[in-house]
Amino acid sequence: MGAESREEFGEKFAPAEDYGELLGHSLYFYTKDTGQPVKYVAPSYAMDVTKTVPRFRSFNAKEHGCKLWWVEYGGDLDTVHDTEQIKWELWKVIYGAWDYIKNSGKYPEAETMTLEWVGCIPGKRESRRFEGDYMLIQQDVIEQRYHEDAVSYGGWSIDLHPAAGVFGEESACNQWHSKGIYQIPYRCLYSRGIENLFLAGRIISSSHVAFGSTRVMATSAHSAQAVAMAAAICLKENISPREVYSHGRIPELQVKLSRMGQYIPDM
């Protein structure tokens, strides 16, 4: 878990030292205009965001839902075991932010608006990542390196967030955009230490920096499709995930994926 040092993989976007910080969790909320005045009394645990959230002026009556992706917390905690603590901290921010919008007097258009829905389960960005026979790193992403066992691809920017999240003084994210899409090799999609374990979604074999790109949903879905079809080959041939690669079954997998509509760059 956490970020690797710059020296480990020679990644220029990595921190100078291994600091163990992660991307945080987010909770969304939605609002609705009722067409008539609505009062809002914040719960006792609501946070005064004007004192605790450096970017509190970014809150407004018009934006809700995924536009508030930056309402994020937990990157400096254990994002596996501390989810409940992270959830409550985000609730404090959300109910405090709505109190600011409704009752500060700065947003008269919010008079007829109500807090329609608040999430209960934080959306995870990063927790554990597993090690496969190959680890995707920054250079694979920005140089679009070729892999003969490519079965998936990504195209999102390397999108890294400060561990302090909504409480940080830094920009809510740093995004580095590559000049094209990149391949994800099959060797990133199975464990190197557990014989019968596939990896997909947010836990594929990648560095923290490369994960900043591979973590998004569409890319995760592409990897999951590749894993599902590889698993079918394993069952049919009675072989392990690694043996799909070592027994020369990658071309077969690539053809099956292509026929199902899975795009693989440069294949």
Language-model-detected regions and their locations in the chain:
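Flavin (FAD/FMN)-binding glycine-rich loop and adjacent Rossmann-like elements that form
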Residues: 1-267
